[in-house]
Amino acid sequence: MLSTLIRRLSRALLWFVAGSIVLVLVFRWVPPPGTALMVERKVQSWVNGEPIDLQRDWEPWENISDELKVAVIAGEDQKFANHWGFDLPAIQAALAHNERGGNIRGASTLTQQVAKNLFLWSGRSWFRKGLEAWFTALIELFWSKERILEVYLNSAEWGKGVFGAQAAARYHFGVDASRLSRQQAAQLAAVLPSPIKWSASRPSAYVASRAGWIRRQMSQLGGPSYLMQLDSSRKL
């Protein structure tokens, strides 16, 4: 009985490992048709009796404003070009902060956010965190930094039912993602921690202040020239 259970669990684990590797490899080239977060938002809207239509249009890397790319890095993950999926000092600082109580602070890199939004459900369990770490490692192993950021920008949530840079640019500013200004990009990046609560097009005092901070960080990073650091040659 025990040996049978072990064999079945081993087989299930093998299928999971193989399946997850295949998925990550496929999405290295193929645009994901959707994300786990999109499904979650759809289900939530049905349960709440307020069904929504998702707004989402995939745009390739070259059709997304460089200003938005840098703004997201400046606001969410300034070590993006240099780490392998995990910012250990930030994780340690977040754990120390959370142990002291108060508002819970996260330390997720852009790669971790892609792994979570693309493949996993919301939550803070250690099991989900373990899966997030697994997918993060796979993504960093098989994708270029440009691809990671491209998928992030096409799957990030920017409002109720609004996903991806193109839908966000049109919804908030009435322009294509390629035409976003630095200020508009900074405002979009500023709401990423809570895109349902905050609005990029009607910024609160806090969002306006955070957008200003992001613009200053963008300048310190070197602006669009920073993107040259995203070295795709290190990938398999």
From Swiss-Prot:
Keyword terms, alphabetized: Cell inner membrane, Cell membrane, Cell shape, Cell wall biogenesis/degradation, Glycosyltransferase, Membrane, Peptidoglycan synthesis, Transferase, Transmembrane, Transmembrane helix
Localization, UniProt: Cell inner membrane
Recorded catalytic activity of this chain's protein: [GlcNAc-(1->4)-Mur2Ac(oyl-L-Ala-gamma-D-Glu-L-Lys-D-Ala-D-Ala)](n)-di-trans,octa-cis-undecaprenyl diphosphate + beta-D-GlcNAc-(1->4)-Mur2Ac(oyl-L-Ala-gamma-D-Glu-L-Lys-D-Ala-D-Ala)-di-trans,octa-cis-undecaprenyl diphosphate = [GlcNAc-(1->4)-Mur2Ac(oyl-L-Ala-gamma-D-Glu-L-Lys-D-Ala-D-Ala)](n+1)-di-trans,octa-cis-undecaprenyl diphosphate + di-trans,octa-cis-undecaprenyl diphosphate + H(+)
Database matches in Gene3D superfamilies: Biosynthetic peptidoglycan transglycosylase-like (1.10.3810.10)
Gene Ontology molecular function terms on file: pentosyltransferase activity; peptidoglycan glycosyltransferase activity
InterPro entries with a match to the protein in the record: Glyco_trans_51, Lysozyme-like_dom_sf, PBP_transglycosylase, Pep_trsgly
GO CC aspect terms: peptidoglycan-based cell wall; plasma membrane
The protein's annotated pathway: Cell wall biogenesis; peptidoglycan biosynthesis
Listed GO biological process terms: cell wall organization; peptidoglycan biosynthetic process; regulation of cell shape
Entry membrane topology: Single-pass membrane protein
Chain segments annotated as transmembrane: 12-31
Keyword Cell wall biogenesis/degradation found: yes
EC number: 2.4.99.28
Any matching Pfam family: Transgly
Job of this protein: Peptidoglycan polymerase that catalyzes glycan chain elongation from lipid-linked precursors.
Family: Belongs to the glycosyltransferase 51 family.
NCBIfam families linked: mono_pep_trsgly
PANTHER family: BIOSYNTHETIC PEPTIDOGLYCAN TRANSGLYCOSYLASE, MONOFUNCTIONAL BIOSYNTHETIC PEPTIDOGLYCAN TRANSGLYCOSYLASE
Name this polypeptide is given: Biosynthetic peptidoglycan transglycosylase
Species this protein is from: Pseudomonas putida (strain ATCC 700007 / DSM 6899 / JCM 31910 / BCRC 17059 / LMG 24140 / F1)
